[in-house]
């Protein structure tokens, strides 16, 4: 009986640790990239030959997630079109026997991936965007990926986080160390280190002044959260910037269950800024098999002028 009980407890814990869904909040206006984003989603901006949102979905897919939930807004139809089947394009490529390109087009959304779209009616902040996905997520833990934070890691950063989620049995936020002077642009956490690069949180503050920041650990665009976060989002009052902040809901969540911060292994490109976007474009071009050699030569020639 004891053995059966232990097996059942282990199975229950494993079921609780399975992350089936990823939420992609993509309703933002993308004002930093106007006029390019006037009629198209900022998440569709390409890094070489793939849009940011595809990198994000691939990261979720490689972590074993097959249910992709997009919280969209006006002018985001291009995201739906990107992950839809392109019959005319595929037929044209098939007719010209361009099999490599045909494979690329078909691999954008594997057949075993389910993409669902829900509209955020008003731009009320990240917390509100996540709440829009509640009925689609259900009563189970889930991931959140902000596509304009391009995280380049191996294994992929979300895969690293799911391992921490399983080992620590709690919600997980990706964090990185920042210069304290930049704290006003991030959610900043405080906590106790329980393992290398893993912190059990006791506090989180949205965009604190440098003098008020509890640490130099800033949250970046990856989260693995308990479904209880939805109840806390509903109780959040508009915070910094007049929006419903996910950070405030996490601050309430960590008072009732474990929430951890994880210093991920990888490099972050802030593609919500022009400079970060350009850095990502250069770095990914330098490893792209089609253009890397010529592009590196070009960069060297530019450095001499």
Region spans (language model):
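N-terminal glycine-rich phosphate-binding loop and ensuing alpha1 helix
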Residues: 15-95, 156-160
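Residues at the starts of beta-strands that form the adenosine-phosphate
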Residues: 21, 66-68, 141, 170-171, ...
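Structural beta-sheet core signal
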Residues: 24, 70, 144, 173-174, ...
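Conserved beta-strand scaffold positions in the cores of enzyme catalytic domains, especially
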Residues: 44, 115-117, 171, 259-261, ...
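Conserved beta-loop-beta/alpha segment of the NTase-like Rossmann-fold superfamily
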Residues: 89-92, 99-191, 225-227, 234-236
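Catalytic-core segments of class I nucleotidyltransferases/pyrophosphorylases
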Residues: 143, 162-166, 193-296
């Amino acid at each position: 009986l004891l053995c059966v009980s232990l097996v059942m407890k282990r199975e229950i814990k494993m079921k609780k640790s399975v992350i089936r869904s990823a939420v992609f909040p993509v309703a933002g206006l993308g004002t930093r990239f106007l006029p390019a984003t006037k009629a198209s989603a900022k998440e569709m901006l390409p890094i070489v030959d793939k849009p940011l949102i595809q990198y994000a979905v691939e990261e979720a897919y490689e972590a074993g997630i097959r249910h992709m939930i997009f919280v969209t807004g006006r002018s985001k139809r291009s995201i739906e079109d990107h992950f839809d089947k392109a019959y005319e394009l595929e037929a044209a490529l098939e007719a010209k026997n361009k099999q490599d390109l045909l494979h690329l087009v078909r691999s954008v959304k594997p057949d075993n991936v389910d993409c669902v779209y829900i509209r955020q009616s008003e731009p009320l902040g990240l917390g509100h965007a996540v709440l829009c996905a509640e009925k689609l997520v259900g009563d189970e833990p889930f991931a959140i990926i902000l596509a304009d934070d391009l995280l380049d890691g191996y294994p992929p950063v979300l895969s690293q986080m799911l391992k921490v989620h399983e080992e620590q049995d709690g919600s997980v936020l990706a964090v990185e160390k920042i210069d304290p002077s930049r704290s006003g642009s991030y959610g900043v956490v405080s906590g106790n280190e329980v393992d290398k690069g893993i912190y059990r949180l006791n506090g989180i503050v949205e965009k604190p002044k440098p003098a008020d920041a509890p640490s130099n650990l800033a949250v970046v665009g990856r989260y693995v959260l308990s479904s209880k976060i939805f109840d806390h989002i509903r109780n959040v009052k508009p915070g910094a910037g007049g929006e419903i902040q996910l950070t405030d809901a996490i601050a309430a969540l960590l008072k009732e269950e474990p929430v951890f911060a994880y210093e991920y292994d990888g490099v972050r490109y802030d593609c919500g800024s022009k400079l970060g976007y350009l850095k990502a474009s250069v770095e990914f071009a330098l490893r792209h098999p089609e253009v890397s050699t010529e592009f590196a030569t070009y960069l060297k020639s530019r450095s001499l002028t």
